[in-house]
Amino acid sequence: MQKIEKSLMTQKTIVENLSQIDSNEKTGVLRPMAVRRRAAARLASVQLGYSAEVTGQSLLEAMPTFLDNYVDDIARQLRVKKMDSEHFYAVVSGVNNRRVELDKMIAEGLSEGWTLMRLARTELVILRAGILELDGMTHIPARAVLSEYASIADAFNADVRFVNALLDGLARRKLRSAEMSAPGQAN
């Protein structure tokens, strides 16, 4: 029970760090509603993953408590009535069904001497969700995925440069190489 309470308290702190996700950092202007709804879904899927990691539950076991306690807070903080539920369930079910494969891709992207066990839980769950989107949701531009998960890493006080570098490297080398090398893409 203490693990669940600790996880829920940590999630409340994270929800308070969301200002960079719902608006443009440079202008302060709110992003479009559809973008914020999808951002809320991404954030919720990462928070659920973190909760499951901390409590030792599966994603599906942790989901009811998480949905009852945090989805409304996330939506309110991102100034949306509700998150993009379809995207949330697609990410959660994808990570749940492909966890071993996603972890293998993360391990392949790590520097020599690094293992999954050495990663912070927050970085691990962010990477799983980001890689899932890069690999399985090709209708979403790779740059958007990279930007969103970098913002989520920042909200979680995770190593943003590490998360971005690993996702970018996998996108360029394996998952979205054609898109990432297309004219107009920054190198």
Predicted regions and their residues:
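N-terminal interaction/assembly modules
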Residues: M1-N187
